[in-house]
Amino acid sequence: MSTRRVWKQSEIKTNPLFSKMRSTIETAFYGNNVTPVTSVAQAYQLAAEEPGVIVLDMPVYKPCEQGLPADAKVLVTNDGKTTGRYAKARRIIGDEGIDEVELANIARDAVYDSRNKEWIAAQTIVGLDKKFTARAHLMIPKDHASILYSWIMNFKFFDAAVKEFYDDSLEIPEGDIYIYSDPDYIVPGHPGGLAIFDPAHNCAMILGMRYFGEHKKGTLTLAWSLANRLGYVACHGGMKRYNLDNGKSYTIGVFGLSGSGKSTLTHEKHDGRYDISILHDDAYIINTEDLSSIALEPTYFDKMQDYPVEHPANEFLLTLQNVGVTMDEDGRKVVLAEDVRNSNGRAIKSQFWTDNRVNYVDEPVNAIVWLMKDKTLPPILKIDDPVLASTMGATLATRRSTAEKLDAHVDPNALVIEPYANPFRTYPLALDYESYKKLFSECGVECYIMNTGFFLDNKVPKEVTLDLLERLVEGTLEFKPFYKYPNLEYVEVPGFEPPFQVREYHHQLHKAFEFRYDYVEKLIGHKNELPEEVLEVLKTLM
């Protein structure tokens, strides 16, 4: 499915796809101060010439195959104090309490006040299969060309080959995605930045925010919203397919915030014991009718905390954000990673990082795993009831990650709920709830919880999680009832046995489910209110 950029004149007057915000943003793209970027190589050159950008002595792997100059190098940009996404800056038009007229006024002023700047713009696609693909546009001041370059490499540049693919995709009655970004424009009263989203009209304006993740996830926010309207489930997680013997396969999706292990589990090769196909480690969609899955982006926006300079994965770097640089023994500028400079150092790695990559999985997904960091839960639980399975996704309990910018009063270690591990939802939560429940109730998808944090006082090591994952795929896990808690089963793991005989443990479980109950109860009467059955099923566990 492809979105639309042009219209017959007879379609324009009463077109519901236009709005105050969309018309303000799209109009800005046509100014005589905006220069279109027409190739990946041009974007690279502009980024390399941006003041402050560091050109490392680390070559890009297979540059020509990615549209880059043959001598292209890895580029570094550093943002300053902010090195993570700032959710508090988001304003969603259509949400209660949001004044569209006020935000439209801010948007028009932002465009006018920045008219003397030189701007650049580019196009990409989001969605890598002909069944779902949307064209996206980004404009940004030339002084921030590195953001545009990273954005182009994160998604897929709209070149001649992509145009042919796009033109052959099914057209849908939705407009292209438009994003206007001015990282230097500070709106009075919004010192941390302001990100205005009009998801119903596929557009956004990002003001005063330099972090690349705002632009990546801002684009995905609009694409996920669009996909939801077309009958897809938005997925912030990883998906891989195990291609087993006798023509069998096992497809699994893991959902979690940054730092939950979703990328690690997705890319794990299990010492070569399995033939594996990877869809993506962060962003995809599932069709609720045929259960096929589509990746939204070709590359990977990965943390650098576990990748010292000599790590083989660094061969596939394209750009780096918020990392250090030093000199090696041969006098070459190389990355100083592992979060020495600051937390949440990041990289865009090319699609060549995975030699087993696919953009579309037509086999039905077999299992969905909620990755949590809830110390009351054992390393793995199986959920046997569709209502409870979707409820536990809607009340996914975890810890905040370094990918987020938090205000000073926020405890980064506090247990929080992030429904379906997706903080980028713009539509009512109940839509996701019903979609996931349908997967579990009508489509035969199994549901599990994996605790990748602490169980009571013991850290669940990666090796334990991987062993459970392998046995899950092979069908050799032996589940037993989780005490008297209905529709929950667990696996006995040495060193992580639930102390059912200890009263305090049941009290902690009660508090954990009560925490979820209270969260859902507070949603009543608001945009994200969930069906009554969610509260009812949580009561059975309390």
Language-model region placement:
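Conserved lysine of the Walker
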Residues: 262
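Glycine-rich, often acidic-flanked micro-motifs
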Residues: 2-72, 236-257, 267-268, 273-275, ...
